[in-house]
């Protein structure tokens, strides 16, 4: 990336964005066709509703346009739209990352915090918001690029610290405990009420 320059890197990112968008459109068409076929074959309209495809079958013309705008997403088709939006935004972040990686990371963290504070998100069709919020998930993209541009070397001493290792172990134990409550509801009392409200749905 650094050797070829920002223009080439940005063009490649946008090209990949277009490829993923086209793939998403094809997957959407196949997915909707399969849902319609299964629903008609087994005469189960509830299946269409569960897959979040009921609006498409009622108003195809409007819903197709909303799907092309990445606003309408059937069940389990949230990931590629998120990736498309993040890749579209990334060339702008890349421009700043090359010049001042730490500043770019700071802006990314600030955007993440403001997203939580003000509830920023993209609107979905026919109602609601994106399940995977691009304003929040952008932090992973920027952090990964920051690490690749030298940030990982700066973090190395902290990552090798015994304190970090024990914090990671404590987190794994906590996550294991939370997971156990899903399979053994009697253990749900171990999760504080305020923590459960903050954490779910996940």
Walk through the language-model features, giving the residues of each.
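Alpha-helical transmembrane segments and their immediate juxtamembrane cytosolic regions
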Residues: 1-202
């Amino acid at each position: 990336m650094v050797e070829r320059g920002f223009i080439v890197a940005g063009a490649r990112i946008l090209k990949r964005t277009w490829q993923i968008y086209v793939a998403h459109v094809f997957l959407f068409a196949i997915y909707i066709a399969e849902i319609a076929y299964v629903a008609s074959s087994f005469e189960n309209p509830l299946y269409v509703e569960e897959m979040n495809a009921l609006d498409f079958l009622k108003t195809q013309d409007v819903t197709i346009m909303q799907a092309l705008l990445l606003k309408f997403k059937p069940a389990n088709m949230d990931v590629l739209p998120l990736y498309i939006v993040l890749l579209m935004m990334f060339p702008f972040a890349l421009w700043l990352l090359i010049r001042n990686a730490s500043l770019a990371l700071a802006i990314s963290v600030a955007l993440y915090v403001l997203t939580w504070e003000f509830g920023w998100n993209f609107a979905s069709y026919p109602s609601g918001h994106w399940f995977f919020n691009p304003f929040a998930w952008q932090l992973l993209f920027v952090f990964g690029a920051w690490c690749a541009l030298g940030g990982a070397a700066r973090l190395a001493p902290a990552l090798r610290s015994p304190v970090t290792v024990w914090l990671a172990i404590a987190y794994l134990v906590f996550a294991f405990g939370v997971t156990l409550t899903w399979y053994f509801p009697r253990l749900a009392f171990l999760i504080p009420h305020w923590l459960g409200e903050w954490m779910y749905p996940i």
